[in-house]
């Protein structure tokens, strides 16, 4: 398998990722700002297919209409010259002081109205550029103090805003869907819709739930101690994986935004196997962008920025290669069969069977030999996982 990225791999990068200057809460930038044209040209040379951005990444908050249009035109020119596309756009409702208490859920009604206007304008830009996904990360939607935010009221305002956006894209005829990006905390002490499960539940309350899915990020779910692959499987199962953010995270701590695979490598392996092949038991795989939302380390110069961008794509392709070998190994197939992984797809009830039938079936309870599972009938899960790790480590081909 070739390890050189191509457009067919659908690798994309956020402008805020390759453009990260190294500033953090404890120190200023260590690199200069990145011009958008240079960013587009360099990721094109590396083999990526897409660039994503927040509005404030492309033109500064408070820019005049002329300044805004100048940057949009420069981006369009670079896209035309390189063939790079914009698959996703999002809006920054977290950096400017006006959003100190959030955008859609700020306690200040005027701020909420301003936030909606800012988003509507950027949806128009997304449609103009051909983006089909609009991500919503509510980084400031939350609180540090329980008494400071009425969560029930905040969720209702969140719902009101998302419903309005759904009306807008429908009435405009835009081919755009929304993807909510969960995160448990940071920058707020607690963020609304903190995990993938919270977001999926919230989506079901909306007036147009078919227009709204999720954009889970590796590090965000792992900050909450969750298994990212398992969460992605549920999002796929519910038809809600509209976009995905790939990066690396090493445990429950601050959002590290490492290169993909440079954190929990085993979970990254199972994730790529799922995205490419549908999981060990089959099921739906993912055909959308493989989007890298990482930060080049503060220690790096501009050469290190592009090395880290390339590393994301190479890590994904290496893991894809390892997943293909894992699937093709006859011993793995034997271990999967011994572990009865596929049997989960056999309905527990027979066709047409009701609770009356299962209550009448003595073999399911009265005559079932439960003691036979003591000292016997192991599932072989450890052997299966050992085979997976040996493939991950390149010990098996």
From Swiss-Prot:
The UniProt record lists the keyword Transcription: no
Q: One Pfam annotation, family name?
A: AP_endonuc_2
CC terms in the record's Gene Ontology section: cytoplasm
PROSITE patterns noted in UniProt: XYLOSE_ISOMERASE
Keyword GTP-binding in the entry? The reply is no
Give the residues the record marks as binding Mg(2+) 2: 217, 220, 255, 257
Q: Name one GO molecular function term.
A: magnesium ion binding
> What cofactor requirement does the entry state?
Mg(2+)
Residues given in the record as Mg(2+) 1 binding sites: 181, 217, 245, 293
Which keywords belong to this entry? Carbohydrate metabolism, Cytoplasm, Isomerase, Magnesium, Metal-binding, Xylose metabolism
- Give the record's family classification: Belongs to the xylose isomerase family.
What NCBIfam families does the annotation carry? xylA_Arthro (TIGR02631)
Assembly and oligomerization = Homotetramer.
What name goes with this protein? Answer: Xylose isomerase
Q: What is the lineage of its organism?
A: Bacteria, Bacillati, Actinomycetota, Actinomycetes, Micrococcales
């Amino acid at each position: 398998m070739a390890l050189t990225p191509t457009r067919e791999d659908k690798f994309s990068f956020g402008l805020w990722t390759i453009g990260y200057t190294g500033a953090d809460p404890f120190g200023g930038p260590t690199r200069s700002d990145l011009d958008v044209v240079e960013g587009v040209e360099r990721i094109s040379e590396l083999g990526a297919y897409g660039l994503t951005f927040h509005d404030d990444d492309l033109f500064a908050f408070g820019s005049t209409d002329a300044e805004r249009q100048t940057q949009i035109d420069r981006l369009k020119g670079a896209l035309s010259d390189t063939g790079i596309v914009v698959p996703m756009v999002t809006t920054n409702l977290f950096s400017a002081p006006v959003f100190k208490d959030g955008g859609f859920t700020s306690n200040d009604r005027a701020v909420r109205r301003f936030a909606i206007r800012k988003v509507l304008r950027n949806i128009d830009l997304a449609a103009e550029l051909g983006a089909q996904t609009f991500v919503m990360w509510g980084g400031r939607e939350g609180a540090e103090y329980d008494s400071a935010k009425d969560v029930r009221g905040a969720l209702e305002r969140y719902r009101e805003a998302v419903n309005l956006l759904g009306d807008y894209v429908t009435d405009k005829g835009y081919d755009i869907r929304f993807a909510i990006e969960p995160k448990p905390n940071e920058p707020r002490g607690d963020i609304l819709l903190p995990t993938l499960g919270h977001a999926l539940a919230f989506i079901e309350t909306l007036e147009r739930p078919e227009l709204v899915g999720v954009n889970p990020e590796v590090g965000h779910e792992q900050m909450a101690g969750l298994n990212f692959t398992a969460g992605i499987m549920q999002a796929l199962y519910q038809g809600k994986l509209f976009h995905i953010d790939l990066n690396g995270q090493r445990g429950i701590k601050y959002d590290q935004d490492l290169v993909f695979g440079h954190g929990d490598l085993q979970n990254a392996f199972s994730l790529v196997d799922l995205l490419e092949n549908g999981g060990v038991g089959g099921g739906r795989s993912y055909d959308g962008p493989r989007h890298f939302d990482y930060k080049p380390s503060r220690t790096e110069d501009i050469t290190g920025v592009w090395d880290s961008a390339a590393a994301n794509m190479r890590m994904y392709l290496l893991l894809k290669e390892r997943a293909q070998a894992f699937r093709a190994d006859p011993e793995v197939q034997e271990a999967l069969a011994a572990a009865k992984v596929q049997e989960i797809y056999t309905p527990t009830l027979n066709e047409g069977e009701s609770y009356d039938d299962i209550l009448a079936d003595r073999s399911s309870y009265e005559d079932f030999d439960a003691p036979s599972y003591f000292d016997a009938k192991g599932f072989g899960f450890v052997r299966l996982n050992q085979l997976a790790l040996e493939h991950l480590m390149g010990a098996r081909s």
